[in-house]
Amino acid sequence: MRVIGLMSGTSYDAIDAAAADLGLAGDRLVLKPLGLMSEAYDSGLREELAAALPPAATSLAGVCRLDTRIGQAFAAAAVRADRELCGGRAELVASHGQTVYHWAEAGRVYGTLQLGQPAWIAEATGLPVVADFRPRDIAAGGQGAPLVSLVDLLWLRGRAGTSVALNLGGIANLTAPDGTAFDTGPACALIDAAAHGLSGGRLDHDVDGALAARGTVHEPMLRRLLAEPYYALPAPKTTGKELFHLGYLRDALAGFGTLTAEDVIATLTRLTALTVADAVRAVRATEVVASGGGTRNPVLMEMLARELGAVALRTSDELGLPSAAKEAYAFAVLGFLTVHGLAGTDPVSTGARHPSVLGSVTPGRDGLRLPPRADWSPVRLVLE
């Protein structure tokens, strides 16, 4: 089955589309990558989205407009991916949408909201669309994240030692072989917020880690940041830009006088490296396989490698899965599992009471024709 996975992460800079030919073969799920592409949000939509994200206030009218506009942007990306990556022969779209809010209190998640109305995708492509993946796990008592953990478990199963998957997006999350999975804290969220806020909006992120490379870590600020209570919470746990946003950063800077943008970003980059390395040590990993936009920041990767010491650090590209679109591939897998009636969660990873078949399905132009329910769940993901 040719599936297009669509994903826009907490950095909300672009829509990643990854196409894969997926099939079950015995106890294996075989994934043949067909290609990937990225479609940047237009500046107006990105600004509208940024203005609506926590801690800012928004309106129901604003949410409705964003749901439609993001859905139309995802639809355009899906049409292009079908044409350029699948030769017009895609059979399913799996859309994560754009997370705008994750409702968590006292370690429990009560709700989550991803925008990007899937009806626009179904209308534009004519294909069935699986979307709204996270709420089913939350209803079962889980965190609704990290959902890529099941894919990580299937993919890294059988590797020597203790291999953990690490995603460095806006938020960092990891998955260990025993199913333990959680958000470690910010990966690029605070770095991006600082780059944007301290450059007067000229920059969206620290390009190639250039600002961090010119800066010096401000130890008092780092100590204040490391005192954040989230880091001490037990797994499973999840977080997002509801906590780690520009206002949070401004509070952290209070009382330190004027710091250069370079020093602030160097400090935030070190914060990510330290908190990720602490999480890796907590699960006694011997290897870290990293993916996500943060892998393109050489300063962050160098700091992280230094903190990890003897623990090997490599990117998912080295194992055959492009780090730039690993999450999009993961949601293609989750969509495939859903239409085959298979669970897309591991309760150990999310804290749910039981595994769940994820998402809601929007029929395509020819109605809803699902494949036969699979008789068993795969235990390994194999790349071809």
UniProtKB/Swiss-Prot annotation:
Its EC number is 2.7.1.170. It is an enzyme of class 2 (transferase). It catalyses: 1,6-anhydro-N-acetyl-beta-muramate + ATP + H2O = N-acetyl-D-muramate 6-phosphate + ADP + H(+). ATP binds at residues 9-16. GO terms for molecular function: ATP binding; kinase activity; phosphotransferase activity, alcohol group as acceptor. Signal peptide: none annotated. Catalyzes the specific phosphorylation of 1,6-anhydro-N-acetylmuramic acid (anhMurNAc) with the simultaneous cleavage of the 1,6-anhydro ring, generating MurNAc-6-P. Is required for the utilization of anhMurNAc either imported from the medium or derived from its own cell wall murein, and thus plays a role in cell wall recycling. This is Anhydro-N-acetylmuramic acid kinase. It comes from Streptomyces avermitilis (strain ATCC 31267 / DSM 46492 / JCM 5070 / NBRC 14893 / NCIMB 12804 / NRRL 8165 / MA-4680).
